[in-house]
Amino acid sequence: MPVVISEKQFNDAHQAFKLHDKKDEGAVSNKELTNLFKSLALHVSDDKLQQWVDEMDEDATGVIRWEKFKILFERKVQEDEDERELRSAFRVLDKNNQGVIDVEDLRWILKSLGDDLNDDEIQDMINETDTDGSGTVDYEEFSALMLG
């Protein structure tokens, strides 16, 4: 579900952006982005950050302007919310609180999603998800399945 980012969150992000805009040019160096996200209590992996820089810094200027950072900020907040919701769903399905869900519960979930999957398609998804063949799915496997 899309996250609604409050005006305060945008203002906080903009203030943080300005603090990291060392030359007061309305832009932050690509190298400074990690610190900028950290200052907003958001963790972005180096690989993800590089992917975003490649996408947003189309002209290879070495900087990201506020308009582009705002897009990245929204994306990161949405990703974090999606992760929270996914973890919450996993905890509900982890009936024994052991960090795994049974593949039969996963089968039920996949049928319930209403994606018109037939039994063979569901079994293929389970086989791809339960990579270690344990008959259970841990959070990493579940996340990979649900987030694609």
Curated annotation (Swiss-Prot):
Q: Which residues form the EF-hand domain?
A: 8-43, 44-79, 81-116, 117-148
Q: Which SMART domains match?
A: EFh
Q: Which InterPro entries match?
A: CALM/Myosin/TropC-like (IPR050230), EF-hand-dom_pair (IPR011992), EF_Hand_1_Ca_BS (IPR018247), EF_hand_dom (IPR002048)
Locate the residues binding Ca(2+).
130, 132, 134, 136, 141
| UniProt cross-references to Gene3D superfamilies, sorted A to Z | EF-hand
An example of a Gene Ontology cellular component annotation for this protein is: myosin II complex
The question of whether Repeat is a record keyword is answered with yes
User: What does the function comment of this entry state?
Assistant: Troponin is the central regulatory protein of striated muscle contraction. Tn consists of three components: Tn-I which is the inhibitor of actomyosin ATPase, Tn-T which contains the binding site for tropomyosin and Tn-C. The binding of calcium to Tn-C abolishes the inhibitory action of Tn on actin filaments.
Reproduce the miscellaneous comment text.
This protein binds one calcium ion.
**Similarity annotation:** Belongs to the troponin C family.
This chain belongs to which protein, by name?
Troponin C
